[in-house]
Amino acid sequence: MGRAYQNRKLSMAKTAGAKTKVYSKYGKAIYVCAKTGGIDPDGNLSLRGLIDRAKKDQVPTHVIDNAIKKASGAGGEDFVEARYEGYGPGNCMVIIDCLTDNGNRTIKDVRQCFSKNHAKIGTSGSVSHMFDHQAVFAFKGEDDEAVLETLMMADIDVTDVELEDGIITVYAPHTEFFKIKTEFTNSMPEYELEIEELSWVPQNYIDVEGEENLENFEKFIAMLDDCDDVQHVYHNAEIKD
């Protein structure tokens, strides 16, 4: 699972849009998180985690601060979460999470991404039952057994720990995210976390093969990434080098 998870992250990184678009998506997510859960990161752990990820992705401090400041005021924009599921090129499964202030616009944009790339949008729950909501941490290291032992000694429920190509990947139920992050900070500070996120991890992967499918897949992901309302795309496609 670990290598495939890294491949998925890489495929998203390859098609990432301009930095300003990435900043905009983080700004929107931080605004919504602060608006709904409070502007103090110490009291809003979800906000704290989101800010940490934004900084790791080199989002400027002023973008983060402006989003929180905006959330602290009265009124403001109303965003709602929207999720779409379906089958992408090569019959891979896809989950798309959005934040939108105009549901009609968002579904129109997402449908267009599917229809233009030989993909098929599905109904709610059509593929999400084939994904697990997981806390995922990845970092350079060699002693995966020691990492597992440390986490278990801290009474943390760990789904799996994998070591491949010098990268250790920890998977755990999403409810364990902040316990694991705290344990790394307190007990394993020598590890620099390259990935620390809540993700929908597929239970199995599918190879996307054939030149046409590969081209459509890359275009599909790029079009979704270009949609302003799309926050996250999860899929079970594995792309061979």
Curated annotation (Swiss-Prot):
Keywords: Cytoplasm, DNA-binding, Transcription, Transcription regulation. Disulfide bonds: none annotated. It is found in: Cytoplasm. Pfam families: TACO1_YebC_N, Transcrip_reg. The keyword Transit peptide does not apply. GO terms for molecular function: DNA binding. One of its GO terms (biological process) is regulation of DNA-templated transcription. SUPFAM superfamilies: YebC-like. The keyword Transport does not apply. One of its GO terms (cellular component) is cytosol. Belongs to the TACO1 family. This is Probable transcriptional regulatory protein CPS_4169. It comes from Colwellia psychrerythraea (strain 34H / ATCC BAA-681).
